Amino acid sequence: MQSGGDFSNGFHGDHHRELELEDKQGPSLSSFGRAKKRSHAGARDPRGGLANVLRVSDQLGEHKSLETSESSPPPCTDFDVAYFHSYAHVGIHEEMIKDRARTETYREAIMQHQSLIEGKVVVDVGCGTGILSIFCAQAGAKRVYAVDASDIAVQAKEVVKANGLSDKVIVLHGRVEDVEIDEEVDVIISEWMGYMLLYESMLGSVITARDRWLKPGGLILPSHATLYMAPISHPDRYSHSIDFWRNVYGIDMSAMMQLAKQCAFEEPSVESISGENVLTWPEVVKHIDCKTIKIQELDSVTARYKFNSMMRAPMHGFAFWFDVEFSGPASSPAKNTSETSIASGSSSISPSGEVNQKKRTNPSDALVLSTSPESPPTHWQQTIVYFYDPIDVEQDQVIEGSVTLSQSKENKRFMNIHLEYSSAGRSFVKESVMR
């Protein structure tokens, strides 16, 4: 973190490094105030043991416990405990369920793939209240293993019972890395996406479930995910947070502006923008095939980008958003380009705020949930990495550089963001941590 004396117009000359140091203290529930998704793995009892880790054979009484030769699962850290506790609060689940774009797209995806779910065995990774597990049971699943480490699993079991589905939906309170399921599964479903797609690192548990239990040729929903980025102009945000200090009830408080910039723009901001804020076509940062991605690939993601500004405007930072696609085993994701949608139903944004959106024309088309600025709003919104000071860009001006997203070494659920960008002969670096 910079001291006030070193801060000059947001940059040291033309190459200013804006650093945010990792918190070296222990976690607290407030550390996960941004968390909007369910936990995916199992909570460690504060006394040191794993809480409520179940074997399916013990619960069903159908199979004898199987000994495994797998390597030991990763330890459950204090950060994990705090993360799991944050998902025991009903408010997080209420917000997710009330997100109609999210919940209705998942239900539609389940029904679209009903022929692959009916009579099959399903695992719901990070089941939360159990709503997706119940959707799968309603679609005719033979059995659904609903796995969650948070104490919300206790309520999920009651929800399942109240809906008369206890014979089909088995709630397992524990980490995916620790619980035992003594059979292979046909389908994995999970709403694992965090802000900026990879925040919270929940995808790792989906990969673990896939490698432990999914049959060859099985179905994973969603099947693919793509993270995008684009430069933006957002003068209203800057005016509201920074220019406000120029005149406060007739008092010159401009001395507050440098501190205000640090406080407002030091960390990534989760907020909603519109297509009118976007200066160029988006670029792909990372495309994920959930059937093939390896856990090691999530440690660090680096992408280079090159944008051509399509208008003259102040550039205030970069916006990030994602799409996820629900394709069946025989489907292929649509080709990724910076100027076309990733799949039918997703959208690409023009700098004028217009949207190229392809609707699904038949049931075999891939279903897409998009969090782009021009798609229906979701609780994910968009993630913005703001500059401390805007950069004026001209029409057709090139903006290029690279972005690296990496898991914090101390707490993998936090995400380090290293952003390099240059334009008109000036180069900059912005570093921050998404907590």
Curated annotation (Swiss-Prot):
It comes from the Eukaryota. Keywords: Methyltransferase, S-adenosyl-L-methionine, Transferase. Coiled coil: none annotated. The active site is at E191, E200. Residues 1-48, 333-377 are annotated as: Disordered. Residues 12-25 have a biased composition (Basic and acidic residues). It is an enzyme of class 2 (transferase). SUPFAM superfamilies: S-adenosyl-L-methionine-dependent methyltransferases. The keyword Transport does not apply. Residues 337-354 have a biased composition (Low complexity). PROSITE patterns: SAM_MT_PRMT. S-adenosyl-L-methionine binds at H93, R102, G126, D148, E177. One of its GO terms (molecular function) is protein-arginine N-methyltransferase activity. One of its GO terms (biological process) is methylation. Residues 80-418 form the SAM-dependent MTase PRMT-type domain. Its EC number is 2.1.1.-. Belongs to the class I-like SAM-binding methyltransferase superfamily. Protein arginine N-methyltransferase family. PRMT6 subfamily. Arginine methyltransferase that can both catalyze the formation of omega-N monomethylarginine (MMA) and asymmetrical dimethylarginine (aDMA). This is Probable protein arginine N-methyltransferase 6. The lineage of its organism: Eukaryota, Viridiplantae, Streptophyta, Embryophyta, Tracheophyta.
